[in-house]
């Protein structure tokens, strides 16, 4: 035992002499930064930090998924009729054709609002409200040379009527493809009627017209238009240079000052004849826009139409006036009776005196 103790003591003394410093075994174990255990601890802390970051990112992804916008094509309406639902689905497909991400511009009270279509559909009561897709021209400012679809909230009846017209047109196209003769005839009649209703008749006069022609032939033509005013509400008389360049300046036509003065006086005379001798003599009302340097546009309305409109207004007002007269008459009757009774009482009182 003593020998073993001596050996251990001698080895310890040798080590102490070689280093010159007391040995700390804990420092050798944990004090060395480059030890593999300390590196493992550092890696462990890095993993913890990265793990927290990944957890936060995963949480954000979950929130984004929860706030994800619904595809308008998959939107289910609880309210509204089947016609309304099919009408709005047809409009959604039209909007998708114009904007694949369903970003639209809504017509609001404060102006145009850029919004996703699903947000509009969420707040829409399909039993009362619908949407309207307003036509917009193409523009180079927007992506792909197109503006965003313009959406307006309208009453449900307006959307349903649009859808019914769409169905009717599609049926007509189907019948035309089959080769139905009846549909062709009805379409032609409808087109003619629409053209008559929408088109405003225009009567052209050139500045180069002679005064005799204006007083005779053109006056008769204008008179015929006014007489046939049952089908035409109002019409325009355009006094122009020519059809290709109607509003050409007088200075560009006549360079010489004398010619310019003569032309200007002639135009003044034509204007005077047209207004005083033709339009004022005929049964119509008129207003004029433009000037003698370029062109004149007269809007002429026959008085027959105005008389008919006044008659219709009078017819509506007549029953109201009659009712008022009856009410006044009924109110006046008891007053007259009371006044007669008062007179009788006074008369009898005087006789007694």
From Swiss-Prot:
Subcellular location, record wording: Mitochondrion
Transit peptide feature, positions: 1-26
Biased composition (Basic residues): 321-336
Family in the record: Belongs to the AIM23 family.
Protein name: Altered inheritance of mitochondria protein 23, mitochondrial
Keywords, ordered alphabetically: Mitochondrion, Transit peptide
GO CC annotations, alphabetized: mitochondrion
Region (Disordered): 306-341
Primary location: mitochondrion
Basic and acidic residues bias: start-end ranges: 311-320
């Amino acid at each position: 035992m003593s020998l073993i103790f001596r050996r251990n003591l001698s080895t310890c003394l040798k080590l102490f002499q070689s280093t010159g410093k007391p040995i700390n075994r804990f420092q050798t174990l944990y004090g060395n930064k480059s030890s593999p255990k300390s590196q493992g601890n550092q890696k462990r802390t890095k993993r913890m930090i990265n793990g927290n970051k990944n957890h936060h990112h995963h949480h954000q992804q979950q929130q984004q998924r929860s706030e994800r916008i619904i595809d308008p094509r998959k939107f289910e309406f609880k309210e509204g009729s089947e016609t309304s639902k099919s009408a709005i689905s047809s409009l959604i497909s039209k909007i998708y054709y114009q904007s694949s991400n369903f970003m639209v511009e809504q017509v609001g009270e404060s102006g145009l609002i850029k919004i996703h279509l699903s947000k509009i559909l969420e707040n829409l009561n399909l039993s009362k409200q619908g949407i309207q897709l307003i036509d917009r021209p193409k523009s180079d400012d927007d992506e792909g040379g197109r503006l965003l679809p313009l959406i307006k909230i309208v009453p449900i009846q307006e959307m349903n009527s649009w859808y019914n017209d769409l169905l009717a047109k599609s049926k007509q196209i189907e019948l035309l493809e089959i080769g139905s003769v009846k549909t062709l005839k009805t379409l032609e009649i409808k087109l003619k009627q629409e053209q008559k209703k929408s088109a405003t008749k225009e009567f052209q006069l050139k500045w180069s017209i002679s005064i005799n022609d204006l007083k005779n032939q053109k006056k008769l033509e204008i008179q015929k238009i006014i007489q046939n005013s049952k089908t035409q509400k109002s019409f325009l008389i355009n006094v122009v240079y020519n059809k290709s360049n109607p509003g050409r300046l007088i200075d560009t036509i006549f360079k010489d000052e004398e010619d310019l003065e003569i032309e200007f006086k002639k135009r003044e005379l034509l204007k005077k004849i047209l207004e005083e001798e033709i339009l004022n003599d005929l049964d119509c009302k008129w207003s004029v826009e433009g000037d003698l340097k370029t062109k004149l546009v007269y809007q002429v309305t026959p008085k027959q139409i105005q008389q008919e409109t006044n008659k219709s207004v009078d017819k509506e007002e007549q029953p109201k006036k009659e009712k008022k007269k009856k009410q006044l008459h009924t109110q006046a009757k008891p007053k007259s009776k009371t006044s007669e009774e008062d007179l009788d009482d006074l008369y009898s009182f005087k006789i007694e005196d």
